[in-house]
Design a protein with these regions (language model features):
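C-terminal catalytic core of tyrosine-transesterase DNA break-rejoin enzymes
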Residues: 89, 141, 145-148, 152, ...
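Basic, Lys/Arg- and aromatic-enriched nucleic-acid-binding interface segment
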Residues: 74, 89, 93-154, 164
């Protein structure tokens, strides 16, 4: 019986990414697979695919878990598991080494705050410098009032605004991670959408963009806008107001949270945010939905007690 050719796990995993994932998943997801490959190369450069056991695989996860939280270890496990299951189905390994894997990890660090309450948001918006052409502050105003993703907001041109009907058309994003930038498709089909804006925001941006051509980008001018720079500006404003800082994505969460708390339906919120389905919205904002359910329960009990 001929001997199996020795194949290193890291080499198989790299080839598996190229064959099965490249061109099939988003660039961000693909980068996560390559990051998993980088960690695997550091942790287990000499582990062979032919002889990998459950013990070997568990040791890889345990080593990774020493410096990462449990959720991150779970993501690492899912990335590797897909390749090993395929290897098992192809007969390259005799059994599934990922079976009954135990996911460990460092103690989770204190969760950063995700959103502002309504009072804090009002203070935040008042603090924005809208009397100048400071692109970042105008960007923050737009995201706070629309819930757009950072890349969606950066991808807006003047012609995406319909000031007469007070709407914004979202059909593309801006690749802010690349030095040269460039337009990219939206995150999913549901992210292509037209959303309503309030009359005040419409008037503000009508004035702000009056000197721009229809195809001019609104926020990206002669230099790149970094996510970190925007987050730093948010942090500066929050500290001035004695508010715990959030991120630019936290402004999107703030927008959605306020809509939920004012009784807007999950279906309408999912459509406005560009979520693929309502499940995504429900899972993301479960804590707020549960808070509302508790408030409703209290109202019901108080009402019944009065009968």
């Amino acid at each position: 019986m001929p001997r199996r050719k020795i194949v290193y796990f890291i080499n198989y995993f790299e080839n598996w990414i190229e064959v099965y994932k490249k061109g099939a998943v988003s660039q961000i997801t693909l980068e996560k697979y390559y990051l998993a490959l980088k960690h695997l190369t550091k942790i287990a450069p000499d582990v062979t695919l032919n002889n990998i056991t459950r013990l070997d695989y568990q040791s890889i996860l345990n080593k990774f878990a020493e410096t990462h939280e449990r959720n991150t270890t779970m993501d690492f496990h899912h990335a590797l598991k897909g390749s090993l299951i395929d290897a098992y189905e192809e007969g390259l390994v005799d059994r599934d080494p990922t079976r009954k894997a135990v996911i460990k990890g460092k103690k989770a660090s204190k969760k950063k705050r995700k959103y502002l309450n309504e009072f804090e948001l009002k203070l935040f918006i008042r603090e924005l410098d809208l009397n100048s052409n400071a692109e970042i502050d105008w960007l923050l105003l737009l995201i706070a009032k629309t819930g757009l993703r950072f890349s969606e907001a950066l991808g807006l041109t003047k012609q995406d605004f319909d000031f007469e009907n007070q709407t914004i058309n979202i059909s593309k994003t801006w690749d802010y991670k690349r030095k040269e930038g460039g337009f990219k498709p939206t995150k999913n089909k549901a992210s292509v959408r037209r959303i309503q804006i309030d009359w005040k925001l419409s008037m503000q941006f009508s004035r702000y963009t009056e000197r721009l051509h229809d195809d001019d980008l609104i926020f990206v001018k002669n230099k790149r806008i970094f996510n970190a720079t925007v987050n730093h500006r948010i942090s500066t404003i929050c500290k001035q107001l004695d508010i715990e800082p959030i991120s630019v994505h936290g402004l999107r969460h703030t927008h959605a949270s306020l809509l939920i708390l004012t009784g807007v339906s999950i279906a309408s919120i999912a459509k406005r945010l560009g979520h693929a389905d309502m499940t995504t919205t429900q899972q993301t904002y479960l804590h707020i939905i549960q808070e509302l359910e508790n408030q409703d329960t209290d109202k019901i009990m108080r009402h019944l007690a009065m009968l």
